[in-house]
Every structure is written in structure tokens, then in C-alpha cells.
Amino acid sequence: MNDSVRTTTTISSTKSLVHSFQLSAILHLFLLISFTPMSAAADQHASHATRRGLLRKLGLEHVPVQTGPSIDVPQHMWDIYDDDNDVDWVRHYYPKEIIEDNEGFLLSYNLSLAARNAHNEEVTKATLKLRLRRNNKARRSGNISIYFFEDDINNDRFQIESRSVDNLTEWIDFDVTAAFLRRTNRISFFIDLPEDVEIEETQSSSLSSLPYARAQSAPLIVFSDLSEPSSVRRKRSAQTGNSERKNRKKGRKHHNTEAESNLCRRTDFYVDFDDLNWQDWIMAPKGYDAYQCQGSCPNPMPAQLNATNHAIIQSLLHSLRPDEVPPPCCVPTETSPLSILYMDVDKVIVIREYADMRVESCGCR
């Protein structure tokens, strides 16, 4: 292995351990405030510190403030969440403006809320979903054409897809990925519909603007991946993905069946978002098995402790010079991601995969 490859590998491993240490510190603080008696002031301070730490881990500066009437997460977003598509971000937008004229509908979407990550995100897929209906019983053939405006100033529009309406279903998906070849904070689509077809007005709308009943029938779903060269992404294995889906549906704590031991090991720890009063914006999961690492790293080091050579040497030196050399620590050695479905500001529904959220194994380091 050459020096450049060795250096890259070391940096990636170090960053992964740093993320694991950060998560462990946050979880231990959460554990302390959950079970340690404190004064009211100390408890409030610790709670705020835990929330700030978790928000930073989630890439947020503040809890998304929800204003106006609440909205329900549509079924197609629940389906995406349960499918484990292995994408970093999925965002769901409703149009901010709908203009109808004799030719069709103009739909405008505000994407500026995602601007904080625009420099390191790459759109991999974008889908415009339309719920359509015929305004009379006569069935006429025709096409639905989707155009997007590349330049707001010149109003130049380009067709990106056309579809027959001979077999009109409740929802029709249009691939509009081509509209995201450049980064933008606002995007507009023109929908050219046959005379006997229109966008459905949803009766069960919980918001009342645009009119929002029609906006709910024209969501834009954008899939994107982080494109940072230095980012360490951990793809969930099939086994991990299956267990995560089961945990989502069951919502129960997983109890470790291993025998109690003082040696370094993974132990149960469940994070309940309701305890943080985040149930208003985190839709799923309600909580998750984060696990934690506890136990000692003695000398001689048992083989099952998954210790590095450095930890073995450090343990030996600690036994000889305990005042000078600290013992190795029991820390996460392998972690897995967690997908969270939450409501961002301005009613943008987000699914995001966060790395290093669940401890899979522990060892001495």
C-alpha cells in the first residue's frame, strides 16, 4: 500500500471514529439526564445541551418551527421511507404558486430551503407527481406535456416529457430530473393538459391556500446524494435494512440477550424522540435502538474485545504505569445509518439518512 492510500484510509477511519465518539457523548448525556437526579436548573441545562448536540448531529441549527395548519405525510412518502432506497436526501415540495390559463397550469416550487446543502448535493432523481381527473365522462385521446423554464428572465421553456392520457390513473409520475442540471432555488413547470383533463382538487386538504387542495395533487419529490469527496457513507446491508424496517414498524425496544459482563460490550440504549419533545416535527421513527458501548478493557485483553494492536499495547503499559498511561476505552467500532422522516420549515417533508446513528459493535481502542 502506498503512502497516499494509507493516509486516505487513516483519515477516513479517524473521521468515522470521531463521529462515533460524538454520538456516544450525546447518548451518554441523554442517559444521564434520563436517570440521574438533578435540580430543575441543571436538568433544563442538560436537556438543552442534549437537544443542541442531536440537532448538530442531524445537520440542523434549530428545531424546524411549524406554522399554520398541520399537514399529513402523504402515503407515497411513507412508501419511500419504508423502501430503504439508500439515498441521502428525499425532499417533498408542494407548489407555492399555481396559475391556470387556457393552455394549462403553471406550477412554481420554492427550493431555497435546501440551499444550505446545495454546494455538496447532487440531484439523482426528481419526480413530479400529478393527480389528474377528467372533467367530463367522454374519453378523449391526447397527451400531457411537461415543460420547465430554464431562465426566469427570458421565460424560455423546454419540453422534458410527454405522456398519453388514454389510460388515465389516479397518480401519474413524470421524470423531471433534467430540470435539475443546474442548481436553483426556484423551479417552474408548465403542464399542458388536454381540454377534458385537469388537476384534481383534494377534498381532505388541511391547508387552505393556492388553493392548497389542488397543490396537494402536484407534489415535487427530489432525491439527492451528498457529493462531498471526504464524506464517509455507510451503505446499509440487506440484513441491517431489514432489521431497521422491522424496528420502524414495531417501535419497540430491542433487549440484548447476551450474558451480563464487565467486559467491553454493546448494551441496550433506546432514544425516544418524545422525551425530547420532538414529536411535532419528527414523523418517524418515534424512537430507535441506538445502543451504547460499556465495560472495561483489561490486561490481558480477551480476543473477543476486538482490540487494536495499539489498544493491546496501551493496556499493557497501563498495567505497568497506571498513573501515566490511561486504559483503553470501550467505544463503537462499527455503526449503521438511520433514516429519519421529518417536517422541515414551510411544510417541506424530508427523508434523510444519517450515518453513524446506531452502534453495531464495540471494541477497545
From Swiss-Prot:
GO cellular component: extracellular space
PROSITE patterns listed in its UniProt record: TGF_BETA_1, TGF_BETA_2
UniProt tissue specificity: Expressed in embryos just prior to hatching and remains constant in most cells throughout the larval and adult stages. Expressed by AVA command interneurons.
Subcellular location: Secreted
Top-rank taxon: Eukaryota
GO molecular function, one term: cytokine activity
Propeptide: 43-244
Signal sequence region: 1-42
Glycosylation sites per record: 110, 143, 167, 306
Disulphide linkage map: 264-330, 293-362, 297-364
SUPFAM superfamilies from the UniProt entry: Cystine-knot cytokines
Basic residues bias locations: 246-255
Protein function: Ligand for the serine/threonine-protein kinase receptor type-1 sma-6 which activates a TGF-beta-like signaling pathway. Multifunctional protein that is involved in body size, male ectodermal patterning, innate immunity, lipid metabolism and neural plasticity. Dose-dependent regulator of body size, probably influencing the sizes of some or all cells rather than their number. Plays a role in patterning of male-specific genital sensilla (simple sense organs), known as rays, and mating-associated structures, spicules.
PANTHER family: PROTEIN 60A-RELATED, TGF-BETA FAMILY
Family statement drawn from the similarity comment of this UniProt entry: Belongs to the TGF-beta family.
SUBUNIT field: Homodimer; disulfide-linked. Interacts with drag-1.
Full protein name: Protein dbl-1
Species the sequence originates in: Caenorhabditis elegans
Recorded name of the encoding gene: dbl-1
